């Protein structure tokens, strides 16, 4: 057993949240931090993680991806579905789609309506979104100008399909918005991305950790697979991990900060003796504290691709040809420009499928090529697609460890599509998307519907297609939810402190009480910025006074 020094804080997981905490906590020179990461470095010369257009590559291997699989999903034809999670400095920000989407203001106001979470309103959170961000066109009431995370906006001269798809959404009666992270999320518009001015992925390893690495009070250990958190009674006092299969440990004077993400954090807690007592006893794990909510309340976003042939030769299909890729790669490598410098998700939208929803329940990503998210099944002809998925499914899943062995993946079950609302939303999503594709703005482009195919019309046909073809949007969350101690399923309080224990916080997407309306990287970074101030004992940033849109019963769409 190799024992490392004592540190003030030990952070488990160098991902979207952990790197923020490591950077902010070490701004205090008298505070020592140990940052543990199961994966390796974020190699800056590896185009797979650094080139935005190469976003599919990290999902295809296991160097940067945990490549979890779910248990057979009972409402999805018993498919074992992908559950990719980032591994390496940067975590999932190293392999995500780089969509900079914060969620809807109402998501956070909804959190704040829950007991114990009163200071999580949108106006409490907005200053921390701004603190994290440097947006390439400058700051305003909603955006930051000097944060570690670089955000790039779509520029004139990008693929003409983006503007056509936004215009088609507006022609179908839905709002137009100039900023999906600004005053009004609802509507169709340009989509920002976490990409540097030189066309590189802006992960939290590049943005945050590069600031902190030179500091003598930060120690980073990669290839450190966390085994368990060590306790003295009810107090977390250290961490044990495996490096080259050899156990090592260190002690924490102040706190252990668990930032493993929505899949890893619950399993680390359960292996450490914190979780549902019956599960832990069945695996002969010594019980430290019974917390039934650990690994419960698991949520995600599910999405479909609707693919169409493109009648004009303007899609990115030629970029998929091997003989075109050296030139694309060279332009990106030497100039930081061109197709390689974009994730190609430069437009999208959020709409309500029905007036029953107070804020958008469907998200769109537009892509000027037809291909699966992980790079499989590319369509060789000119083609394009819309990704559409529901945002706040009432379905709930769970995560259970299978053994004490940290190398064994957990049992993951999302229970996708287990609620009738899920089916209503996906039927509506496919029909609305077809209406958008039929608008005049897309008439010069839209050809044959490749997938699902125009023969698919009835509810039963659509349902069968969803069961067989819907895929994760890679947004697992909520598996250690925040809430008041009176809520038996809450795992942490509004400051990330684990109920019933001392010296242990969780800071990652697992503590969301309900998944947000959009992608998870930006909200997770915001949460870490906010809780970093709490951990450091700093006065919270002043609440924003910026106005924000509420539908307040407005029609879902304009009717001619």
UniProtKB/Swiss-Prot annotation:
Keyword Flavoprotein: yes
The protein's required cofactors: FAD
Regions that span the bilayer: none
GO molecular function: betaine-aldehyde dehydrogenase (NAD+) activity; choline dehydrogenase activity; flavin adenine dinucleotide binding
Domain of life: Bacteria
Chain residues that bind FAD: 8-37
InterPro entries per record: BetA, FAD/NAD-bd_sf, GMC_OxRdtase, GMC_OxRdtase_N, GMC_OxRtase_C
Function: Involved in the biosynthesis of the osmoprotectant glycine betaine. Catalyzes the oxidation of choline to betaine aldehyde and betaine aldehyde to glycine betaine at the same rate.
Protein name per UniProt: Oxygen-dependent choline dehydrogenase
Organism: Stenotrophomonas maltophilia (strain K279a)
